Amino acid sequence: MNEARAIARCEEAAALLPPRFRRAALQMPDHRKRYTEEFRLRAGQPPAALLPEGEVTLPYFGADSRVTPRDLAQMVDAVTDYSRYACAETLRQGFLCLHGGFRLGVCGTAMLRNGAVASLRDISSLSLRIVTERIGLAEPTADSLFCACLLYTSPSPRDRSLS
C-alpha cells in the first residue's frame, strides 16, 4: 500500500473514534499514521496506537486524559448506528465488522444463557484494527504450495446475513 493510501486509511479509522480521541489520532505525524495498525481504547488507560515498534500513547492529552466506560459505549453506539441489537451476533463473538473493512474488537463482561454468550455488557476495551492491503505478501508461500490447492473458509456472519 502506498504511503498516501496508508495515511488515508489511518484517518478513516480515526474518524470512527470518539471525538476527543479522534482529534488526537488525526494530529499524529504522517510517519506514524502510515504505520498505525490499530487504535486501542481501554477503560482507565490513555488512548493508544499500535505501531510496528509497539504500542504508543497518543501524546496529545494530559496525563489525566483516560478512556472512560462512557467513551467506549459512545463508540460502540456510533459504529452500530445506535442499534447494538442489529449487530448482536458478531458482538457476542467479540467483534464488529465496520464499513470500509475495519474491524472493532470488543472486550467486556459476557452474559451467558444456557452456557453460551448471549450478550456483552460493561465494555472494558476496544481495538480498532486498520485493514491494509499487502500486495505480493503471500507470493513466497504460494509458490511452495501444491499446484492445485483450494483454500476454503466459511463466510463471516456478516456475509451469511447478506445471502
What residues fall within each predicted segment?
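P-loop NTP-binding catalytic core
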Residues: 84-149
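Conserved ATP-binding/catalytic motifs of P-loop helicase motor domains
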Residues: 163
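Conserved small/polar residues in nucleotide/adenosyl-binding loops
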Residues: 152-159
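A short, sequence-level motif marking secondary-structure junctions
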Residues: 61-67, 109-111, 153
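Flexible, glycine-rich phosphate/dinucleotide-binding loops
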Residues: 48, 112-113, 160
